């Protein structure tokens, strides 16, 4: 029995692993909305007997405590020291799940307590669940516990990877993250691999010298969202128990406005163009889709009450679940009737002026004063950008808005308009004006061959 559950927004994988004959199963690295695992187990005629944490996660809220409350046993690596009932396994310890034998391998490096899980059963391929140690095309980052531990963890990462690479090349590799995750660099899109394939093709596994590996892995560290440190604390303590299926309250526009006046933040989930044309004053724009939780984790303070504005109630409901996955629990409700109802109630509205790539180029050629802020990643920026643009990735805008001069209009640009709309809304919150966002983004610039490299 093997079923993979994948959160596209956080690029996070969890697994249901078990024995078809005896109907026993475990969950590996569960996310917070745990009902999906119970439902999958029921459908398979199985009973959940354990939740296994490969490590204390930094990028999402674990569902292990939720499962513990239902009587499921929680297993972790040595030294995890969770603040709720759990069992810390020893290196080499085994767990029988029906006719499937699970062997725990202590593999420090990404974190000190990290374990991999080897699943073996007669007539089945051996499978290694590698958590954040080994990815398809990449390896885990060793820096999330702070500078003082980074070098030692990087050295341990090398040793743990060497141990895993000495295993049978036919063993399947099932990592905890896919492309887009910030838990490692260079992660591929494929959901799984094999030891042999990674041994041959993974660039980070071609180092025979530990010091050379350490230099390489530390030279390619992804950005670190500010919510990562908070997630570590939440997962160590055990996340507060919540009901992800709770129906969001429908807030009358006037009630939502009153909450906003008292400090609540309105998250406008509509597309960038709709947001630009008009939105509740003070709202920020995180367009509905798989990345709502990801971007909110970057830019939303954790204890702030939130109000959602969406085109459809179902979008607000799904967004609220995504927010729970990154520990943003204080969603007060969704605005009933959406933006039309807000306007109909004569409540304050703001706009974000838009400018096309062609008009921006013309303004630059005329020498009009402006500051272009490219909110893509540094790697994207290095691949080509607008003349004289400065690079501040969208997620860093709240911390770095003060770096921007106020002597000329600010113009935000990204690849297609999603991130730059978020950035523009954050800058508007800071009172920065005049302000404009580039429609079509760098895609339009490339089409017009207007790029500086």
What is each residue range found by the language model?
Residues 17, 29, 55, 67, ...:
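Divalent metal-coordination and catalytic microenvironments
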Residues 126-127, 137, 151-244:
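Divalent-metal (often Zn2+) His-rich catalytic cores of metallo-beta-lactamase-fold enzymes
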Residues 1-47, 117-131, 137:
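Conserved beta-strand hairpin/beta-sheet module of binuclear metal-dependent hydrolase folds
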Residues 28, 48-57, 73-79, 106-109, ...:
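Active-site neighborhood of phospho(di)ester-bond hydrolases with catalytic His/Asp-centered motifs
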Residues 30-31, 56, 79, 110-111, ...:
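Active-site metal-binding loops of divalent metal-dependent hydrolases
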Residues 2-5, 15-16, 94-123, 249-252:
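Core dinuclear metal-dependent hydrolase active-site scaffold
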Residues 141-143, 197-239, 244-245, 264, ...:
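Rhodanese-like catalytic fold shared by cysteine-dependent sulfurtransferases
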Residues 32-75:
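Active-site metal-binding motif and surrounding structural segment of the metallo-beta-lactamase
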């Amino acid at each position: 029995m093997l079923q993979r559950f994948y959160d596209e927004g956080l690029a996070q994988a969890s697994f249901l692993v078990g024995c078809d004959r005896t109907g026993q199963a475990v969950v590996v690295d569960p996310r917070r909305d745990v009902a999906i695992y119970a439902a999958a187990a029921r459908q398979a005629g199985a009973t959940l007997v354990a939740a296994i944490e490969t490590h204390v996660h930094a990028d999402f809220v674990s569902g292990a405590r939720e499962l513990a409350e239902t009587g499921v046993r929680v297993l972790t690596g040595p030294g995890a020291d969770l603040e709720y009932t759990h069992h810390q396994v020893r290196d080499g310890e085994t767990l029988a799940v029906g006719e499937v034998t699970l062997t725990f391998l202590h593999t420090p490096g990404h974190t000190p307590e990290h374990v991999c899980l080897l699943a073996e059963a007669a007539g089945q391929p051996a499978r290694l669940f590698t958590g954040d140690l080994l990815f398809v095309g990449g390896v885990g980052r060793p820096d999330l516990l702070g500078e003082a531990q980074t070098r030692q963890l990087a050295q341990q990462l090398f040793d743990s990877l060497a141990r895993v690479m000495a295993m049978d090349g036919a063993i399947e590799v099932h990592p905890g993250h896919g492309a887009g995750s910030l838990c490692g660099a260079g992660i591929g899109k494929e959901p799984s691999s094999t030891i042999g394939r990674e041994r041959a093709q993974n660039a980070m596994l071609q180092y025979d010298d530990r010091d050379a590996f350490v230099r390489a892995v530390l030279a390619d560290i992804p950005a670190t969202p500010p919510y990562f440190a908070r997630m570590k604390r939440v997962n160590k303590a055990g996340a507060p128990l919540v009901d992800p299926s709770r129906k969001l309250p429908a807030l009358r526009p006037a009630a939502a406005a009153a909450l906003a006046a008292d400090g609540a933040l309105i998250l406008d989930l509509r597309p960038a163009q709709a947001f630009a044309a008009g939105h509740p004053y003070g709202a920020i724009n995180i367009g509905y889709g798989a990345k709502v939780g990801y971007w909110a984790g970057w830019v939303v303070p954790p204890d702030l009450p939130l109000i959602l504005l969406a085109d459809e109630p179902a979008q607000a409901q799904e967004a609220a679940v995504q927010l729970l996955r990154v520990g943003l629990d204080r969603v007060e409700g969704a605005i009933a009737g959406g933006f039309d109802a807000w306007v109909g109630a004569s409540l304050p509205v703001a706009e974000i002026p838009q400018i096309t790539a062609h008009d921006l180029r013309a303004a630059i050629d005329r020498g009009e004063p402006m500051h272009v802020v490219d909110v893509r990643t540094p790697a994207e920026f290095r691949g080509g950008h607008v003349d004289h643009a400065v690079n501040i990735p969208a997620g860093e805008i709240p911390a770095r808005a003060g770096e921007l001069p106020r002597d000329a209009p600010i113009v935000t640009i990204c690849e297609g308009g999603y991130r730059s709309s978020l950035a523009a809304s954050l800058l508007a919150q800071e009172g920065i004006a005049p302000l404009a966002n580039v429609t079509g983004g760098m895609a339009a610039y490339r089409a017009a061959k207007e790029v500086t490299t």
